[in-house]
């Protein structure tokens, strides 16, 4: 039952001090002096006149102002039913009434009737267990009584008032005020008549009267920077063609599969001229590079995916593609966690990219950043006038070194926001895995901090973040069998890839940062001195099976003055390429999955520059073209030899032949699950050819040379073993037989035993 407004109540309402606009606006039934009558109120800022228009007859009834140019009311006689109607208004800037506006009254659709967010939804969200909260909060296209519109919902528990603003209401927060849904902290409103493409924000009025304009934390699309508005988007219009891929993924154990990842920053892989606009979508210019634009998701699908497939990589890993305001952050300072960046196109365009990758047999991994977020005013920071998403105490809630804020993992709704976000990318965009950035920064309360707050037991372990990771990974694998959850964890935190039920964090892969640093230190040395540091090559095998490791040379290793991979290698031009080939050879035969950052496959000299594309012109030169061919050959070898991947995480998959040769040579055997699947690997990390080098082997017969990094086809010197070697009946290295090999300088050799074939009788 409605009520008549006093002058004081009118003033409060037009200044956005009510939390239930449905109690005031729209159709109301009034009881007064024993009589019942209906009325309709409308809040229309900057209106000269407002009319209620009866839909059936077109009759327009002028509404009376309760507040000048803002709040209007029309009363009906007792017993007169309220008609089906819409509103019409003449604005103050249209004195002649030449551009009258018409719209459906949002407040004639009670939220109880809309029923988009139920009590169970609110309960699960406040508990931190609504795994599909993205289907409820944010902007969603719905139809009520045959009227199409958008249901908006946002969590802002400490706000005095929240409104939706956009072009559809001239960015005036008085017109579309939201209703607070009980004690959940959620505000909601259904706005009829708007649809996909509508730009909007939330106007949040704090408890002390300040007003913030915020992008939608659950918005599916945002404007291209520097604009900051959210965009209504329908994620259900794309028709997928990857069902066979998803079914195969669900039936596949990734730890027993070949995984070789090509890490890509979409904005700097390849550019196009601004004078050559894309066939579809808008042209977004690259900052600091005149007359240059980004490729769109659809253009990248046509160029990047065939390139990756040709090179033989199994997956593409994308540096963050969630919306971020600053290109120079590489995507790691996210504002729109549910919005794929508009720099390269629409959500449907990104779906097309992933779909095309799956059809080509390539998985898609995205970098995900739950560890921190930027302080930009339109983002999550101080969202409702309080520290809503972040910890309030800066000793826990701020990364001084990065200038960012830390999520409050102990708050149910914040944890729900993040966990559901990871699930969202799998469900809506069909991604195959996430790589969680900066895990160590989340696990330690004293990470990069001079002042910090210990946990309740006095330790530095971040117990709330630990619980967050366990919940995250449990749900990822529950809903997405065969998926990847990869941790970038740079310390020796135990059990990162162990199951949660035995006390682990639940990831299924972890970057091996120790191996990466050891190998770069080793290969940076003059080759003559490597013999004095064999531990840098062998130490990783002391712990290689304590976790499920991925060996990665990532974007972080080719920036900030570290030089690119070739620049890290000593010696002249030829020796740099030879050392890099030997390193890649060791990487692809060492236990663990593989990741290479873009441009490493052809040996770029310049460091990675986010404002420029790769130095593709280098491929016209033989050394670079042949290095790329070598990487493709390594990928082919990896995928064709089960010994190199089926037991990556098991000690049974590896055996040293000799790890103590002071000449900078190591040799070992990789075993597959099938006892007949095994290969021999010999690495010579010094610039000396060893023509009569003997190693022990377990079987008699012929050993075919599968790979020689010094082959002429890879721009090597051509020294080798003429395709293979026969064994000698000479025990060596505690093995019953041996091979006498010619070891090229700075090389990796891979050999495979050929079982003896029975000789057919001539009779």
Swiss-Prot record:
Residue numbers annotated as active site: 437, 488
Listed InterPro entries: A-amylase/branching_C, Branching_enzy, GlgB, GlgB_N, GlgB_N_E_set_prok, Glyco_hydro_13_cat_dom, Glyco_hydro_13_N, Glyco_hydro_b
Pathway(s) served: Glycan biosynthesis; glycogen biosynthesis
One record GO biological process: glycogen biosynthetic process
Keywords attached to this entry: Carbohydrate metabolism, Glycogen biosynthesis, Glycogen metabolism, Glycosyltransferase, Transferase
An example Gene Ontology CC term for this record: cytosol
Top EC category: transferase
EC number annotated for this UniProt entry: 2.4.1.18
Subunit description: Monomer.
Name the UniProt record assigns to this protein: 1,4-alpha-glucan branching enzyme GlgB
Record gene name: glgB
